[in-house]
Amino acid sequence: MIIIGVVVVIIFILIVGWRSASQSRQKEAIRLATTTSTENSGLLEYILPEFIEKYNREVKVIAVGSGKAFQMGKDKEADVLLVHDRAGEDAFVEQGFGQGRYDVMYNDFVLVGPMDDGLIRQDEQRDILLGFKKIYQEEKAFISRGDDSGTHRKELRLWSAVEIEPESGNYISVGKGMGETLIMADEQLAYTLTDRASYLAMQEELDIGIVIENDALLFNPYGIIPVSAEGADWINQEGGQEFIDWICSDEIQEKIGQYGVEEFGQALFIPNHQ
């Protein structure tokens, strides 16, 4: 009987070990291609530990511009995209590269620049198109991200809306993320377009400030997209869907809405999954 008992215990241990190993294999990391704004703002650092602990699954964050994130999705180098270029997101899904798009949150863009040069009057602080016109007409320095990010794409659409092609020596395209672009604009006392979250997260380091905000044209929605696994069996569909369900859950939506309130007196992102 003792021998039988020992055998049963050994079998039980082997089964448990096999199941544990199997579960470990299933919990492969997911590759999240996302914008630099979600990283620069500190949002991902704030929410991701909860996902990792709950699901025992690592998240490999690749923070790039939205354009680069779309390309990574097309090349099957990411499992999930968290981006902020609605036109690009819709096209990505319509072309079959993504399996749907889900609202996650939004904030807005703001124009930042030197506060004391008098370019933008108080009654003009909600008119982004007028601001862009005046920057061009007065030959003020403007730093463009120039990286095909969601922010860069938004900036180009604003220039197009005022029928201006900014190619003068005062327009500097740097090919950098939001944080580096803000630092360069600050050093050169130049203007730049930024998402509000990135600016607020860095404002203590900057002398430039918000000169135009709260224009409806500056609305900035973020969407999450699972990358299609067609022709790419290495795409982590299970982990990707797990992440999407998690970030869209009531619990994490509430957490997103709390981020920044204590430090900045306002949420850096407004949850809007429905």
Label for each model-derived stretch:
Residues 106-108, 139:
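Residue-level signal for tight coil/turn positions that link beta-strands
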Residues 111:
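Serine endopeptidase catalytic core focused on the charge-relay Asp
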